Amino acid sequence: MKILVAVKRVVDYAVKVRVRPDRTGVETASVKMSMNPFCEIAVEEALRLRESGAATEVVAATVGPSQSADTLRTALAMGADRAVHVLHDPDPSRPLLPLAVAKILRALALQENPGLVILGKQAIDDDCNQTGQMLAGLLNWPQGTFASKVILNKEKATVEREVDGGIETISLDLPAVITTDLRLNQPRYATLPNIMKAKSKVIKKVTPEDLDVDIRSDMEVVEVTEPPKRKAGVILSSVDELVDRLKNEARVL
């Protein structure tokens, strides 16, 4: 069985995000980029399923500019068998919406015919948490979201997911779509030999037009601004002063 894994290139989680001077979006020039952490978990889970014998091939896919190939090479270095790059140069004022990404992944799924599609539950740049659900809807496949455990056999996938007050266990007929939670696994580090091998591997390149997918966005970003800076804290000398400030400044009493 083949597993298709979607990955995304994002600003590294350790980088302090800054807004562009023209306020059209987040500054990405000369900024460290990396694979979305939830996507790393998705790749790791696919590799573990292949190593257990439940799957035979892992195909990584991404949508983005030419630089996104680095993210695919990370997936290849981790152990993915093949990679597909859907080339798309982003427009900050017309970002690629989750529905457009889901349509692209649907087209890839119809081409690759996987038994399972695994995605991170969300990306840390936009936190939409929509693509996996939309993809399942477009494919009319069952879905298991926020997976914290996945057990796969030839015909079904058993998924444990954390819900309010406990753990829910669901059974999905294959093919299916699964989105990963942070608790699912701990991604492996790519070894230096595998990193070097990944650099020489051929990545298949296609465009949304090749897949006959319309990715035009109806949403326009008007402006992006940084959150207001927090005021410095004040040390109060007495309870009376605290009550006075709550009453006259905060006006909560």
From Swiss-Prot:
Pfam families: ETF (PF01012)
Annotated keywords: Electron transport, FAD, Flavoprotein, Mitochondrion, Transit peptide, Transport
UniProt-listed SMART domains: ETF
GO MF term (any one): electron transfer activity
InterPro entries in the record: ET-Flavoprotein_bsu_CS (IPR000049), ETF_a/b_N (IPR014730), ETF_b (IPR012255), ETF_beta_N (IPR033948), Rossmann-like_a/b/a_fold (IPR014729)
Superkingdom of the organism of origin: Eukaryota
GO BP term, pick one: fatty acid beta-oxidation using acyl-CoA dehydrogenase
Cofactor note (record): Binds 1 FAD per dimer. Binds 1 AMP per subunit.
GO cellular component assignments: mitochondrial matrix; mitochondrion
Co-factor requirement: FAD; AMP
Role description: The electron transfer flavoprotein serves as a specific electron acceptor for several dehydrogenases, including five acyl-CoA dehydrogenases, glutaryl-CoA and sarcosine dehydrogenase. It transfers the electrons to the main mitochondrial respiratory chain via ETF-ubiquinone oxidoreductase (ETF dehydrogenase).
Entry similarity comment: Belongs to the ETF beta-subunit/FixA family.
PANTHER family named in the record: ELECTRON TRANSFER FLAVOPROTEIN BETA-SUBUNIT, ELECTRON TRANSFER FLAVOPROTEIN SUBUNIT BETA
Protein name: Electron transfer flavoprotein subunit beta, mitochondrial
Source organism: Oryza sativa subsp. japonica (Rice)
Gene field: ETFB
